[in-house]
Amino acid sequence: CGSGAIPNEYILQLHKENLVDAICFNLEVWSEDLFAKICPGKNKFVGYKNWISALEYAVDIFGKGKVYSAMVAGIELEPEYKMTAEEATELALHGAEDLCSRGIIPIYSLYWPVAGRNLPETFTSLKNYFETLNIEYANIRSKYGLKIWEGFMCHRCAYMQLECDIDNN
């Protein structure tokens, strides 16, 4: 349900009226600084801290493992953000740990830069980053007893995500 963090009263209404079984507010990136740079509209109209608060409130209503947040994995590697693959991986895993500890499940979609299509090393770096992130992230989900609920996203029906396939293995 939705990609935007909605006010608490609407979250509660969706639950009370049994309109949705799980909810997803797309934070997109981890870190307040990156959020402000990459998501200026979301930052201006909702704000990073309010986005996190909406996700936490949704966990209070829907329960642990029924609240998701889509994340764009690899956008941190764009030159303007000045991050190495190791730094980007560490940041993303820190975010995964933090969100999972709150009962929120991040869903990582691979960033696909249009400008990099003629730069094979860009795609190799992204592929390696994405593989490392997903392997380590599976360990984090396991640590918190979280699995992707099949009512939200199932094995073989994901777009550019690996979580369901890893969980199903």
Regions found by a protein language model. Name each.
Residues 1-4, 62-68:
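Short beta-strand/loop segments at the ligand-binding rim of alpha/beta enzyme cores
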Residues 1-10, 15-54, 107:
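Core AdoMet radical
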Residues 2-6, 28-30, 72-76, 111-114, ...:
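Active-site beta-loop-alpha junctions enriched in small/polar residues
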Residues 35-41, 67-81:
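Short, flexible active-site loops
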Residues 53-57, 61-66, 79-169:
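Auxiliary Fe-S-binding modules of radical SAM enzymes
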